[in-house]
Amino acid sequence: ADVALLMDGNKADMLLTDPPYNVDYIGKASELETKKIENDKMEDSAFQDFLTSAFSNAEENMKAGGVFYIWHAEIEGLNFRAACKKAGFQVRQCLIWNKNSMVMGRQDYQWKHEPCLYGWKDGASHLWASDRKQTTVLDFDKPQKNNLHPTMKPIKLFDYQIKNNTKGDDIVLDLFGGSGTTIMAAEQNGRRGFVMEYDPKFVDVIVDRWEQFTGMKAKKIKE
């Protein structure tokens, strides 16, 4: 119902989203105190149900042929793929974001990449607006600062994905707004960003970021 309210009868041309990874990530103490991510520590079956519900809502509000990009954690790949299948999304490829530096952790091999599931809704052909030289490895630098959100993505990365599969004033949907990278990338390409975020702290981050970028004032339509 919330997604239908957001869309108001519109259908999305793309889903570009970065859901919680279910890894109980908490940012460093030196970063903003808002660094805890909601719904990031759930039992296996509950997490898959959570994702399935979100993806099903997205699928219902997308055009046939609409492309999806779903970022996720490698260790939760099975749950993400299973949720996609249950929601009616057919994963066609898995893209890899190759970062310019690793992320320090406690595991034997330090993480230097993040995967992204790519595909499109059945029922129509999808739009591919780029050339035939693009590969499944995406080389983009990490944001220099992660002070807005612990898993913040660079605008250039989402800008690249939006350019590859949308045109004009197409609608880009994101059900996990986070730091607002999707709406920022949509804005600078003239696309219409339809974004949801559960945590009020990050809603404020998104609004502030958009206002600074556009020089405009956000309007609250209703409580």
Language-model regions: role of each:
Residues 215-223:
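Short mixed-charge
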